């Protein structure tokens, strides 16, 4: 274990900064769920289906951003910042292309897309109304997310939560006015929630552009630097990012399939899943913040050539991830009742009971998530091995989780809570392959130019 207090101070400042940013980001969707939940269960369920489709885009955009973070953190560790704008430019190209594709799919076939996830006509109708407006935010979200992630790779983390806090306030205010029709505004329901989120995303981008123009001093990013890049860096970027993108794509698709399985079990199950997932995202931000911080710390350590320090660093991080997981799981379990009270009286009795059961399941699986996701996406990916996660999740999700859960739901007709557990239990058993890979040290790689050979075992 590392004993220097400065390490823990630095790590937790970074982790909590990223956690706060994630909290504010997820709170935007959470407030949509809460405020629409008090308006109408069908509206809440419809928007939750749209959010699941958007989760696919979010996963792809995060994959595009993670490639820039892995490369950027190692270049930062080498005190070599010149290549980073070229890498960011490459990430924006790929992220923008994926956003345009998602817009076309959502605009051309919204009903058919949501029909895959639910067989409830009223829920689908609410989702289509939401899609008609929110799809315009996809490119804005993509550009903002990649820029903020890229700045994070060089230690600039405060911008993210400043942006997210500002847009959360705007989103809540506009939701209050436009969903319910307060203070003379029209009562727009799901369309009001979509308008509020679209405006919030536009404000996010404006804040980022202002920061880059007037405050950022390390990379000195300009539109010219991001457009006219050395295209040879695209190869570097794709070499690192392609496995991450493939992993994120299949993970996002798997989450849509999971939502579809639950969505075809009834409206109450759809509503309970929406509440459980949104609550988990908000309450697990410290675990994911620690994961992101670990990726930056490990990447910088390898980039600086300090492989001899990795064993102690990794052991310390493993302990921290485990403690955070237990704490997060207990928090989710204890706050189930208070969270559901926030949704008021719009939930049916069945949806309420299912929500309590689903959140109890998540409280258990979160302990595994905190350890194995942080070790995988934080340490292993931050160390330069971006392919392991893609292979593991491909096998786990498509050969075990999805087939078994589909059989449980539609062939064996098991209770919804059992199906929900079978959809989430991979978070527990993946501890084994992740731990084996972590302690093999085969993930330690330098991915920057001039040092691409695999590093010796620490």
What is each residue range found by the language model?
Residues 1-18, 72-139, 185-241, 298-365, ...:
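Short alpha-helical transmembrane segments in multi-pass integral membrane proteins
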Residues 2-34, 38-39, 52-67, 71, ...:
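N-terminal transmembrane alpha-helices
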Residues 13-32, 133, 167, 200-204, ...:
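Transmembrane helical elements of multi-pass membrane transporters/channels
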Residues 23, 27-45, 114-121, 177-188, ...:
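Helix-terminus/linker motif at the lipid-water interface of multi-pass membrane proteins
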Residues 41-52, 127, 131, 267-282, ...:
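Small-residue hotspots at the loop-to-helix junctions and early N-terminal turns
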Residues 44-104, 141-160, 259, 272-336, ...:
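Small-residue-rich hydrophobic transmembrane alpha-helices
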Residues 56-59, 171-175, 205-209, 282-285, ...:
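Hydrophobic transmembrane alpha-helices of multi-pass small-molecule transporters
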Residues 65, 134-153, 160-168, 193-208, ...:
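Short runs within selected transmembrane alpha-helices of multi-pass transporters and secretion channels
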């Amino acid at each position: 274990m590392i004993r220097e207090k400065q390490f823990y101070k630095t790590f937790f400042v970074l982790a909590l900064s990223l956690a706060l940013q994630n909290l504010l980001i997820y709170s935007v969707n959470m407030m949509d769920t809460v405020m629409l939940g008090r308006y109408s269960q069908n509206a809440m369920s419809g928007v939750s289906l749209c959010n699941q489709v958007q989760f696919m885009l979010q996963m792809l955009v995060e994959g595009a951003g993670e490639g820039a973070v892995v490369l950027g953190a190692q270049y930062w560790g080498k005190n070599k910042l010149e290549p980073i704008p070229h890498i960011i430019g490459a990430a924006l190209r790929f992220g923008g292309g994926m956003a345009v594709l998602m817009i076309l799919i959502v605009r051309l076939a919204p009903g058919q897309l949501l029909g895959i996830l639910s067989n409830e006509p009223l829920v689908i109708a609410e989702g289509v109304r939401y899609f008609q407006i929110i799809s315009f935010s996809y490119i804005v979200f993509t550009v903002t997310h990649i820029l903020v992630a890229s700045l994070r790779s060089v230690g600039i983390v405060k911008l993210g939560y400043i942006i997210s806090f500002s847009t959360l306030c705007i989103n809540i205010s506009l939701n209050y006015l436009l969903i319910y029709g307060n203070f003379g505004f029209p009562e727009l329901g799901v369309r009001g929630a979509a308008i509020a989120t679209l405006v919030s995303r536009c404000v996010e981008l404006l804040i980022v552009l202002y920061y880059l123009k007037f405050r950022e001093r390390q990379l000195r990013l300009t539109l010219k630097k991001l457009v006219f890049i050395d295209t040879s860096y695209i190869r570097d970027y794709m070499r690192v990012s392609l496995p991450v993108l493939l992993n994120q794509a299949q993970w996002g698709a798997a989450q849509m399939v999971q939502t579809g399985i639950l969505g075809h079990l009834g409206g109450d199950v759809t509503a309970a899943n929406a509440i459980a997932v949104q609550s988990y995202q908000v309450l697990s931000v410290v675990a994911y913040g620690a994961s992101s911080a670990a990726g930056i710390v490990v990447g910088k350590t390898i980039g600086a050539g300090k492989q001899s320090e990795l064993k102690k660093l990794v052991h310390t991080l493993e302990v921290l991830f485990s403690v955070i997981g237990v704490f997060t799981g207990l928090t989710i379990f204890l706050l189930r009742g208070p969270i559901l009270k926030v949704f008021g009286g719009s939930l049916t009795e069945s949806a309420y009971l299912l929500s309590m059961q689903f959140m109890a399941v998540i409280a258990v699986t979160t302990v595994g998530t905190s350890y194995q996701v942080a070790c995988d996406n934080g340490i292993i990916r931050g160390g330069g091995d971006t392919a392991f996660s893609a292979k593991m999740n491909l096998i786990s999700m498509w050969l075990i989780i999805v087939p078994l859960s589909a059989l449980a739901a539609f062939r064996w007709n098991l209770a919804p809570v059992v199906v929900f557990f079978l959809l989430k239990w991979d978070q527990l058993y993946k501890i084994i392959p992740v731990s084996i890979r972590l302690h093999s040290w085969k993930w330690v790689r330098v991915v920057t130019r001039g040092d691409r050979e695999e590093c010796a075992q620490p």
